[in-house]
Amino acid sequence: MRQLAFISARLGVPRFLVLLLILVFPLLPPFFLSGSAASAAPLALRQVAPGVYVHFGQHKDFEAGYDGDIANIGFVVGSEAVAVIDTGGSYATGMALKEALRAITLLPVRYVINTHGHPDHIFGNAAFMDDAGGAAPPQLIAHQRLPPFLARRGDQYRRNLARQLGDGAAGSLLIASTGGIGVGERLLLDLGGRQLALRAWPTAHTDHDLTVFDRASGALWTGDLLFIGRTPSLDGDLKGWLAATDALAGDRATLMIPGHGPVTRDARHALARQRDYLATLLRDVRADIAAHRDMTQSMATAAAAERGG
């Protein structure tokens, strides 16, 4: 009781309020806590090039044990600031990425870049917006078509996440940029002695794909324009994705960081594998349409021989 009286006197509040706080605080859910009280175990990171850090998502799908951690996410560190590239599939995953980042650098996060709006890449945005340590929150950057995409899909994504994660979905808000980069436009971001070149693509994997090229290391974050060791999933235009795959094959990047799967310095091989799959998928679907086959069955069997590579 002496300790209770001491705390009450120091805080200038009645004893019953101090006692209430002591009793209730341990019962608060994690998303009511701030700072280290709500911190998650940091994600495992790999430095794939100087100043370029990647967390590799697990090889799972959205139904088999999904926990918000299946996409490749990470960040690039300059001399003045940091850019985060994709934030994971939940607030908890985003917080774990932030914890890992803070173990490496205390530089401010100046930018959060979304390569596209699929839920496994974007639900962690809120983790970087809710606690800027007194500094201005980072600028959210994405393709200009991402905000309308999330306006259409957002409710569905939130319902799905609540079903998949239950209480683990707490704090997972869809926070998107208010503007964005238009198709064919490029944007240079300065992190201090380090520039990132962003490119907005025509419809391919989605209608709002964005890539991030780190000029200092030659590393290209492709988002889901490239899958390695995973079956590519289409939410855009198949012919457009083939065109984007061909364009990436001519890119000057020395290292490619895909949206899913391991990084590669042999991008031509990885892109050729993906192109074979997409081209076979297009051929098989066209053949099924010509034969008036059921499209549900077609999507289950098309390019079956190419999957898994």
Describe every region a protein language model picked out.
Residues 47-102, 210-222:
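Conserved beta-strand hairpin/beta-sheet module of binuclear metal-dependent hydrolase folds
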Residues 99-184, 188, 283:
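Active-site HxH/HxHxD metal-binding segment of metal-dependent hydrolases
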Residues 85-87, 110-118, 141-143, 221-223, ...:
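Active-site neighborhood of phospho(di)ester-bond hydrolases with catalytic His/Asp-centered motifs
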Residues 91-93, 117-123, 147-150, 206-209, ...:
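Active-site environment of divalent metal-dependent phosphoester hydrolases
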Residues 16-34:
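Bacterial N-terminal signal peptides
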